[in-house]
């Protein structure tokens, strides 16, 4: 799973905010406009084995990974900020477990 810098080639690129397959999936599951500005993203610093899942307004979940950057756990809080997730959103995200996190171009 590639992390793509949310602000690539701009003065904001060092903010460490990234899109990925999980954030795209969450946008779809929540019914967000794919061309809108209000989208899910992850904050990446690779310090503690966890990437926070964010949306403007708050942190609503996490992607946990091991020392090889393999995803081991994903969880999204369904009663905070975004109220439009399907009931099984966390189950649907489990398909990403086992994927390797890589930095994109």
Positions of predicted regions on the chain:
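Acidic, low-complexity, intrinsically disordered interaction modules
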Residues: 15-19, 23-91
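Short acidic DE-rich linear segments
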Residues: 102-105
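N-terminal trafficking/processing presequences and adjacent post-cleavage segments
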Residues: 1-11, 15
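Charge-rich, solvent-exposed alpha-helical interaction surfaces
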Residues: 3, 25, 92-96
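Compositionally biased, intrinsically disordered low-complexity regions
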Residues: 7-10, 82, 95
């Amino acid at each position: 799973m590639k992390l793509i810098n949310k602000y690539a080639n701009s003065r904001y690129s060092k903010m460490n905010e990234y899109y990925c397959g999980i954030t795209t999936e969450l946008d779809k599951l929540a019914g967000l406009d794919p061309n809108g500005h209000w989208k899910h993203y992850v904050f990446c610093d690779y310090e503690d084995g966890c990437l926070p899942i964010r949306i403007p307004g708050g942190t609503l979940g996490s992607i946990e990974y091991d020392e090889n950057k393999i995803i081991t756990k994903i969880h999204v809080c369904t009663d905070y900020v975004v109220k439009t997730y399907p009931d099984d959103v966390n189950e649907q995200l489990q398909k990403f477990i086992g994927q390797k996190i890589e930095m994109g171009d």
